[in-house]
């Protein structure tokens, strides 16, 4: 199954990592979503790429310095907990890519995934090898993926972490890299492609998924073969 991943939802059209953004991605044809998780001052799992609210919500406040109640108030309830996303969106997509922005709360994330019975739908991804190693120590079966831009030996690192996915910045991955990954039983999801031309190019290179801010680009790919839809 080819993964059409809504990057932070459909952030080209809605505010990133909000319910509106995730639902828009699904409406536009995404069969997977990607989101980012941080932890609040009171230990709640918050869906946000940045640790500061300024860029998205215009408030110069760090998530790690605020409680969930304070964050909800400052964002007019638009900021979400991971629990809210999993309960609302979890059964409406084939996969949810949960990016750990920091290490130290892997157990909380896994507990919530198990609580919502979404173990088969989640891929935990991160730039942080220590976070992925901790996830694997805690759960031998859940899928994980190593995110990277430039990396000398990503396949070796992913295999050492017992990960199933490589999640590279698309500009730094080539057809031969994808073929090598597949030979090592690793799947490849590239980020972030917003051009129809580039999406076609990387599908031709045999990637297993594309993360995009514009999930509607997949609808325009009339040359996608049936087994890649």
Task: Kindly give the residue locations of the regions a language model identified.
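Conserved SAM-binding loop
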Residues: 14, 98, 124-125, 190-192, ...
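Alpha-to-beta junction loops
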Residues: 30-31, 140, 206-209
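Conserved N-terminal beta1-alpha1 strand-loop-helix module at the mouth
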Residues: 1-60, 77, 112, 121
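C-terminal active-site rim and adjoining tail of enzyme catalytic domains
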Residues: 72-79, 146-229
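Alpha-helical segments flanking ligand/cofactor-binding loops in enzyme cores
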Residues: 19, 23, 87, 133, ...
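Non-membrane alpha-helical structural segments and their capping/turn regions in soluble enzymes
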Residues: 15-19, 79, 83, 103, ...
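Metal-dependent phosphodiesterase/phospholipase catalytic core, i.e.
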Residues: 42, 49-150, 161-164, 168-170, ...
């Amino acid at each position: 199954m080819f993964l059409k991943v809504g990057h932070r939802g459909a952030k080209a059209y809605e505010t990133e990592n909000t319910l509106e953004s995730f639902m828009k991605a699904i409406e536009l044809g995404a069969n997977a979503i990607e989101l980012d998780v941080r932890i609040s001052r009171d230990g709640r799992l918050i869906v946000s790429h940045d640790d500061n609210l300024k860029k998205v919500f215009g408030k110069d406040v760090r998530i790690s310095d605020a409680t969930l109640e304070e964050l909800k108030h400052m964002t007019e309830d638009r900021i979400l907990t991971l629990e809210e996303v999993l309960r609302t969106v979890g059964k409406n997509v084939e996969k949810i890519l949960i990016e750990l922005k920091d290490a130290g709360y892997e157990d909380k994330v896994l507990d919530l995934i198990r609580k919502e019975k979404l173990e088969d739908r989640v891929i935990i991804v991160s730039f942080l090898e220590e976070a992925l190693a901790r996830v694997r120590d805690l759960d031998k079966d859940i899928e994980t993926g190593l995110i990277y831009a430039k990396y000398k030996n990503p396949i070796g690192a992913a295999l050492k972490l017992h990960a199933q996915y490589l999640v590279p910045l698309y500009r730094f991955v080539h057809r031969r890299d994808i073929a090598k990954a597949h030979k090592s039983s690793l799947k490849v999801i590239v980020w972030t492609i917003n051009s129809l031309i580039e999406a076609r190019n990387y599908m031709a290179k045999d990637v297993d998924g594309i993360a995009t801010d514009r999930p509607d680009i997949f609808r325009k790919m009339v040359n996608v073969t049936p087994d890649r839809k």
